[in-house]
Amino acid sequence: MAVPKSKKSKSRTRMRRSHDRLAMNTYIEDATSGELRRPHHIDLKTGMYRGKQILEPTDDI
């Protein structure tokens, strides 16, 4: 069975764990509708993506 040869320091452990944090989702304001949406995603309110109509617009309030 694998056993560590020496103890890992707190510094080494914490440096390794520094990449384990969760990233927050980023949102941008759509230029045409003013709605918040994820970058590189369809605006679900208008159905537009990069200036083209992809989906039918929704009328949900």
From Swiss-Prot:
Tell me the disulfide pairings in this chain: none
Q: Pfam family example for this protein?
A: Ribosomal_L32p
A single Gene Ontology CC term: large ribosomal subunit
Q: Which InterPro entries match?
A: Ribosomal_bL32, Ribosomal_bL32_bact, Ribosomal_zn-bd
Name the Gene Ontology molecular function terms of this record. Answer: structural constituent of ribosome
The alphabetized list of GO BP terms reads: translation
Query: Which terms are listed as keywords in the entry?
Result: Ribonucleoprotein, Ribosomal protein
Protein family: Belongs to the bacterial ribosomal protein bL32 family.
Which PANTHER family does the annotation name? Answer: 50S RIBOSOMAL PROTEIN L32 (PTHR35534), LARGE RIBOSOMAL SUBUNIT PROTEIN BL32 (PTHR35534:SF1)
> Which protein is depicted?
Large ribosomal subunit protein bL32
Organism in which the protein naturally occurs: Hyphomonas neptunium (strain ATCC 15444)
Highest classification ranks of the organism: Bacteria, Pseudomonadati, Pseudomonadota, Alphaproteobacteria, Hyphomonadales
Per the record, the gene is rpmF
